[in-house]
């Protein structure tokens, strides 16, 4: 949850959620499909439950 959002290196268009440490809430971002980090969640609820 503390890592910055990282969309990844590929060019897919996959909606995911990450925890924004500045706003202190989960937000939507577009994941590229590969790479990235562990601050990436399938649903808003999963992000909120974890972070």
From Swiss-Prot:
Any single GO CC term annotated in Swiss-Prot or TrEMBL for this entry: extracellular space
SUPFAM superfamilies xref list: BPTI-like (SSF57362)
Gene Ontology MF, one: potassium channel regulator activity
Principal cellular location given in the protein's record: secreted
Cystine residue pairs: 1-51, 10-34, 26-47
General function of this protein: Potent toxin and weak serine protease inhibitor that displays activity on both trypsin and elastase. May act as a neurotoxin by blocking voltage-gated potassium channels (Kv1.1/KCNA1 and Kv1.2/KCNA2). Has a neuroprotective effect, since it suppress, at low concentration, the 6-hydroxydopamine-induced neurotoxicity on the locomotive behavior of zebrafish. In vivo, has strong reversible antilocomotor activity. In addition, it is lethal to zebrafish larvae at high doses.
Name of the protein this chain belongs to: Kunitz-like toxin PcKuz3
Species of the source: Palythoa caribaeorum
